[in-house]
């Protein structure tokens, strides 16, 4: 398949792996965080870590929007959905994300709450049109990639004069989270992680461009390479990071130039800035309160803001203390470091959000990595 098979060529991948081994200095570590959940999935799916020398380590960051959603926001959505006049529209990944005390949207639906899975923002608009006597709330979630469709949906609701439609906004931003990790490496008792460079997200960067990452190269001295999702994309990006570290450079390089530009999608960014504004702070699972990292609807669109419309109170709840999802999202621990992984916590019975989404580090390792763990234990 054109534009896919070319980036999965085995011989080229082996050549890139050989180049990384040749250029990585065995006397020092190379610690690179991939921020995008799609990259985490690709690394596990294609076994890329097995091709790297032991001193080149990939650290899984908080790049999965479902994974970083705090339990309190799930509880807020459940409370809303339990109202008899509400239809809550959500994406499928959200249904099993655990809230407090084992609660989830899926369990709330089983108890009778009218929670409907949708595949696009347009589906939610249609449900609102078909149910004029009910309040329809869309559970908006995602990074910069999925924010423009939500903005377009709100504008469309205005044009259609939908009075029974609103949005529970949970859109978050990538650069503030990256800054939080670099500025606050020690959070509670989770621990510290050293980072030598970033593999920048692909889809997010198609929207915001490469320019926002220049801050991290200039102020923190951390190289950033924007990469695509295919195995050759990732291997080339890692080689580019190794070379920057060896040459004591800290620049933003764009490996994914076939889809990403410096300025990004100007039309999409304008649409978002027209509808949304920054929150003073927003809670991330694993990171805590991150300043200016979340979006909310501007005052002009407040009637479409479910938190305003239904006077929703912010809920903050503690995560399961046995679950290491917070430390995994910060890159401090790996899925196998969690005592729950593969025992009581599986994709069928997730105890933490990292096991829910296919882009979560735990779900990716469960699907692709646990068999290698077993082989390594047998070999040892």
Swiss-Prot record:
Any Pfam family: HypD
InterPro entries with a match to the protein in the record: Hyd_form_HypD (IPR002780), HypD_1 (IPR042243), HypD_2_sf (IPR042244)
Gene Ontology MF, one: carbon monoxide binding
GO process annotations (BP): protein maturation
Residues reported in the UniProt entry to bind Fe cation: 36, 64, 67
Keyword presence, Phosphoprotein: no
Pathway given in the UniProt record: Protein modification; [NiFe] hydrogenase maturation
Keyword GTP-binding: no
Keywords, sorted A to Z: 4Fe-4S, Iron, Iron-sulfur, Metal-binding
Gene3D superfamilies, per database record: 6.10.20.100, HypD, alpha/beta domain 1 (3.40.50.11750)
Domain of life where this protein originates: Bacteria
The protein's required cofactors: [4Fe-4S] cluster
PANTHER family per UniProt: HYDROGENASE MATURATION FACTOR HYPD, HYDROGENASE PROTEIN ASSEMBLY PROTEIN HYPD
Family: Belongs to the HypD family.
Cited NCBIfam families: hypD
Role noted for this protein: Involved in the maturation of [NiFe] hydrogenases. Involved in the biosynthesis of the Fe(CN)(2)CO cofactor.
Annotated protein name in UniProt: Hydrogenase maturation factor HypD2
